[in-house]
Amino acid sequence: MFEKEISFIKSLFNKENIALHEPCFIGNEKKYLLECIDSGFVSSVGEFVTRFEEALKEKTKARFVIATNTGTAALHIALLANGIDENCEVITQSISFVATANAIAYTGAKPVFLDIDENTLSLSPKALEHFLENQTYQKDNLSYNKTTHKPIKACVIMHTFGLSAHIKAIKELCEKCHILLIEDAAEALGSTYENKALGTFGKCGILSFNGNKIITGGCGGAILSDDENLAKLARHLSTTAKIPHPYEYDHDRIAYNYRLCNINAAILFAGLENLELFLENKRELAKIYKDFFKNHDKCKFIDEKSNEKSNFWLNTLLFKNENLRNIFLEECLKNNIFVRPVWKSLPSLKAFQNCQSNELINTKKLEKRLINLPSSVRIANKKE
């Protein structure tokens, strides 16, 4: 049924096995790795961690950047630094990678799952507005859940597949109800809305540099913020809360060993030097996909919206029904083309089935019809 589509995808990558999103190392990775090894500083202290943080500040225009060993760790610390704990709740979207909900759960807080927007695949502003108007009340400059009577202190949105959420509308709703906005921009490095980097609209944002991201160090994450006090606390919590001293080991609270290692930072710093090239390449691939699937009779390409510039981390198709999606998925896999369905909705997972959620109309309508296409940067690694 999808012979033409499979042939087209094969022509784009010209490989026997086509990955969903493989790493691309074409710059100074080996050079910086050797420098890192020769320095003797390969763990959580070293020149490349600082250089990477400074370069990421320049790319995102965030005042402060704290590098961590994963995006999940970054989100966990961001929540803790904003005072999220077992005594409160956090709004988030129904479809996201499980790490979004896990990080909330690590703090002891309960996630409240709201529906996604059918165009952005991120949190629906309409669902958020309906929930805030009908299921919360205000007291002492806090929003409380009418069902549990617990304060809702934060809203975590995820910019799905590098596409921007309706970030301005969501931010306005959060500010109106005294709810902190935290952006899970794990998939959105290089994406912007109105020329402002995703991850820099809320109180803080996070990025991920896992092996399948647009740049990678094998692992890695980062917290972005313009709030100096929050940034200081986040850095403190991510480095075991060690009190600075020439030789004593003293720690003022329970904290975490989440600091990015210098050896990973060396690879990331090299990748960041090529970010603009990668973004240009990925946007070119997205246009090719968009043109091919335009007016397709079985699916449509999920495109960026006005005022948005996406990194198109994972190009995405929405099929007319689940059966068509499954046929496409199976035919691609038989031809060694790795495509994937979207994650199962978070409220459907065993760990979160007892958490509150609203009527997830779009979630139920979309989750079994979406497919991510191969989206690697199509630049050959340099030959030695």
Q: Over which residues does each language-model region extend?
A:
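Active-site phosphate-binding strand-loop segment of PLP-dependent enzymes
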Residues: 119-217, 223-224, 229
